[in-house]
């Protein structure tokens, strides 16, 4: 049982870490592409900014879902009998 709990804790930490890493990379790419687009066509800045914040909000949901799944596996572990 202790081995199972330890492995679940490690798996949850990896799940949360990779979710946060992917989101950080996504935010970096999103911000860079936004700046490139605004530099090319400044008149579209308000429309692009609205879309950027919408996508950023959706992108931010990924680590929150990962944290929820990780906490579920830690506290309500279905693998322990």
UniProtKB/Swiss-Prot annotation:
<protein>
    <recommendedName>
        <fullName>ATP synthase subunit c</fullName>
    </recommendedName>
</protein>
<keyword id="KW-0997">Cell inner membrane</keyword>
<feature type="transmembrane region" description="Helical">
    <location>
        <begin position="7"/>
        <end position="27"/>
    </location>
</feature>
<keyword id="KW-0813">Transport</keyword>
<dbReference type="InterPro" id="IPR002379">
    <property type="entry name" value="ATPase_proteolipid_c-like_dom"/>
</dbReference>
<dbReference type="GO" id="GO:0045259">
    <property type="term" value="C:proton-transporting ATP synthase complex"/>
</dbReference>
<keyword id="KW-0066">ATP synthesis</keyword>
<dbReference type="GO" id="GO:0005886">
    <property type="term" value="C:plasma membrane"/>
</dbReference>
<dbReference type="InterPro" id="IPR005953">
    <property type="entry name" value="ATP_synth_csu_bac/chlpt"/>
</dbReference>
<keyword id="KW-0138">CF(0)</keyword>
<keyword id="KW-0812">Transmembrane</keyword>
<keyword id="KW-1133">Transmembrane helix</keyword>
<dbReference type="InterPro" id="IPR035921">
    <property type="entry name" value="F/V-ATP_Csub_sf"/>
</dbReference>
<keyword id="KW-0446">Lipid-binding</keyword>
<keyword id="KW-1003">Cell membrane</keyword>
<keyword id="KW-0406">Ion transport</keyword>
<keyword id="KW-0375">Hydrogen ion transport</keyword>
<dbReference type="Pfam" id="PF00137">
    <property type="entry name" value="ATP-synt_C"/>
</dbReference>
<dbReference type="InterPro" id="IPR038662">
    <property type="entry name" value="ATP_synth_F0_csu_sf"/>
</dbReference>
<comment type="similarity">
    <text>Belongs to the ATPase C chain family.</text>
</comment>
<comment type="subunit">
    <text>F-type ATPases have 2 components, F(1) - the catalytic core - and F(0) - the membrane proton channel. F(1) has five subunits: alpha(3), beta(3), gamma(1), delta(1), epsilon(1). F(0) has three main subunits: a(1), b(2) and c(10-14). The alpha and beta chains form an alternating ring which encloses part of the gamma chain. F(1) is attached to F(0) by a central stalk formed by the gamma and epsilon chains, while a peripheral stalk is formed by the delta and b chains.</text>
</comment>
<dbReference type="GO" id="GO:0046933">
    <property type="term" value="F:proton-transporting ATP synthase activity, rotational mechanism"/>
</dbReference>
<comment type="function">
    <text>Key component of the F(0) channel; it plays a direct role in translocation across the membrane. A homomeric c-ring of between 10-14 subunits forms the central stalk rotor element with the F(1) delta and epsilon subunits.</text>
</comment>
<keyword id="KW-0472">Membrane</keyword>
<comment type="function">
    <text>F(1)F(0) ATP synthase produces ATP from ADP in the presence of a proton or sodium gradient. F-type ATPases consist of two structural domains, F(1) containing the extramembraneous catalytic core and F(0) containing the membrane proton channel, linked together by a central stalk and a peripheral stalk. During catalysis, ATP synthesis in the catalytic domain of F(1) is coupled via a rotary mechanism of the central stalk subunits to proton translocation.</text>
</comment>
<dbReference type="InterPro" id="IPR020537">
    <property type="entry name" value="ATP_synth_F0_csu_DDCD_BS"/>
</dbReference>
<feature type="transmembrane region" description="Helical">
    <location>
        <begin position="55"/>
        <end position="75"/>
    </location>
</feature>
<dbReference type="GO" id="GO:0008289">
    <property type="term" value="F:lipid binding"/>
</dbReference>
<feature type="site" description="Reversibly protonated during proton transport">
    <location>
        <position position="60"/>
    </location>
</feature>
<dbReference type="GO" id="GO:0033177">
    <property type="term" value="C:proton-transporting two-sector ATPase complex, proton-transporting domain"/>
</dbReference>
<dbReference type="InterPro" id="IPR000454">
    <property type="entry name" value="ATP_synth_F0_csu"/>
</dbReference>
């Amino acid at each position: 049982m202790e081995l199972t709990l330890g492995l679940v804790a490690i798996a949850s930490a990896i799940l949360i870490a990779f979710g946060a890493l992917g989101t950080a990379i996504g935010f970096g790419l999103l911000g860079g592409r936004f700046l490139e687009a605004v530099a090319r066509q400044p008149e579209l800045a308000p429309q692009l900014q609205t879309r950027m914040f919408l996508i950023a909000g959706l992108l931010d949901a990924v680590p929150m879902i990962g944290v929820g799944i990780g906490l579920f596996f830690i506290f309500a572990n279905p693998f322990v009998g």
